[in-house]
């Protein structure tokens, strides 16, 4: 999220972990404005079911912008059922080329339980390496912790929960109130 356009707004850590045929997406619940926590129980991870194909989306950035993107993604998935990569690429193209969408301040992590994609307003659709992806203010902390925890015998959900707890201990814009969704 751009500090230039939304000075003082901070928040969100979203993490996706794939292991042993399962994908877990976890997001914290904190929304901050400047030095003030405005809400500690926001739900930034959503389960969608367009055309009978389950998808989990986590978002960081402006909530209104993220919901606009979620609606667009759902339409793309309905137009291309079961084709997550195609839907994400089509969304990224629209996001990059449309004058209105271009100004939206959000990032998404999207999974169907097999593939994980990070979708950005710069037109990027990235598949993570090492079966872990993270976005948001505490994203780098969660990513580093999860990558280290992937060396253990922990399952995907335990890796995600522990990595998010580590991120919440380090990032002042991340809390330990998690929303966790599992596919697979």
UniProtKB/Swiss-Prot annotation:
Superkingdom to which the source organism belongs: Bacteria
Major localization class: cytoplasm
InterPro entries xrefs: ATP-dep_Prtase_HsIV_su, Ntn_hydrolases_N, Proteasome_sua/b, Proteasome_suB-type
CDD domains (alphabetical): protease_HslV
Cellular location(s): Cytoplasm
Matches recorded under SUPFAM superfamilies: N-terminal nucleophile aminohydrolases (Ntn hydrolases)
GO biological process: proteolysis involved in protein catabolic process
NCBIfam families: ATP_dep_HslV, PRK05456.1
Entry similarity comment: Belongs to the peptidase T1B family. HslV subfamily.
PANTHER family: ATP-DEPENDENT PROTEASE SUBUNIT HSLV (PTHR32194:SF7), METALLOPROTEASE TLDD (PTHR32194)
Name of the molecule in the record: ATP-dependent protease subunit HslV
């Amino acid at each position: 999220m751009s500090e230039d356009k939304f000075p003082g707004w901070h928040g969100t850590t979203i993490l996706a972990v794939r292991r042993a045929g399962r994908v877990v997406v976890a997001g914290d619940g904190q929304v901050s404005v400047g030095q003030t926590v405005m809400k500690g129980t926001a739900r930034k991870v959503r389960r969608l079911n367009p055309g009978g194909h389950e998808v989990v989306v986590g978002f960081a950035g402006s909530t209104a912008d993220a919901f606009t993107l979620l609606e667009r993604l759902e339409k793309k998935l309905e137009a291309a059922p079961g084709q997550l990569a195609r839907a994400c690429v089509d969304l990224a193209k629209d996001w990059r080329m449309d004058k209105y969408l271009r100004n939206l301040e959000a990032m998404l992590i999207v999974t169907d339980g097999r593939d994980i994609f990070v979708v950005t307003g710069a037109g990027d659709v990235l598949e993570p390496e090492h079966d872990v992806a993270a976005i948001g203010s505490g994203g780098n902390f969660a990513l580093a912790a999860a990558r280290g925890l992937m060396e253990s015998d922990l399952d995907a959900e335990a890796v995600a929960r522990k990595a998010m707890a580590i991120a919440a201990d380090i990032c002042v814009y991340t809390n330990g109130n998690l929303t966790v969704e599992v596919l697979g």
